[in-house]
């Protein structure tokens, strides 16, 4: 009703980031609905200064995750760099998407992380576009 709810939860970084990935993936899956008219596939090669990252997405309903990125440091901006993999894995499986992420090259860990997140956003945006030429879902089986 009229009250405010506030809950402070002290949870480790790993579980917090993983839970955020699960929540985002679930929200993406629910927002896509039956996927009628969706382009389904999207990719982005994104430069961030000296870094180049690649992301490819298939919203076909079969979760799979490929990740190829390494970092010089254990943390970046207060986040454990290993948690990027955990986040994207959780998004991929919760959204039921095939997700490939690769940092082709780069030196600065911040640029690598930022390029991966932005490439993912751009690839997802491309895959979720609707095309009037697509009748139903883009699948030879007729279902995703």
Where are these regions (language model features)?
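Short, small-residue-biased leader/transition segments that mark boundaries at the very start
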Residues: 1-6
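N-terminal auxiliary interaction/assembly segments of multi-subunit proteins
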Residues: 7-15
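Ordered, amphipathic secondary-structure segments that act as subunit-interaction surfaces
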Residues: 18-39
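Glycine/charge-rich, flexible interdomain linkers and switch-proximal surface loops
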Residues: 36-52, 136-144
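A generic local secondary-structure boundary/capping motif
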Residues: 42-45, 54-56, 88-91
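Short beta-strand elements
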Residues: 53-65
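Mixed-charge, glycine-accented linear interaction segment located at domain edges/termini
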Residues: 62, 66-67, 76-131
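Solvent-exposed, glycine/polar-rich loop segments of beta-barrel outer-membrane systems
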Residues: 68-75, 133-144
């Amino acid at each position: 009703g009229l009250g405010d709810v506030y809950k402070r939860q002290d949870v480790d970084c790993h579980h917090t980031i993983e839970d955020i990935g699960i929540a985002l993936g679930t929200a993406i899956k629910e927002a896509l609905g039956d996927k009628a008219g969706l382009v389904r596939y999207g990719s982005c090669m994104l430069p961030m200064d000296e870094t180049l990252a690649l992301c490819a997405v298939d919203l076909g309903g079969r979760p799979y995750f490929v990740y190829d990125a390494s970092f010089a440091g254990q943390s970046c901006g207060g986040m454990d760099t290993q948690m990027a993999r955990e986040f994207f894995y959780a998004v991929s499986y919760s959204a039921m998407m095939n997700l490939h992420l690769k940092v082709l090259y780069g030196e600065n860990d911040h640029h690598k992380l930022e390029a991966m997140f932005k490439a993912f956003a751009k690839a997802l945006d491309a895959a979720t576009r609707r095309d009037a030429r697509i009748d139903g879902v883009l699948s030879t089986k007729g279902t995703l």
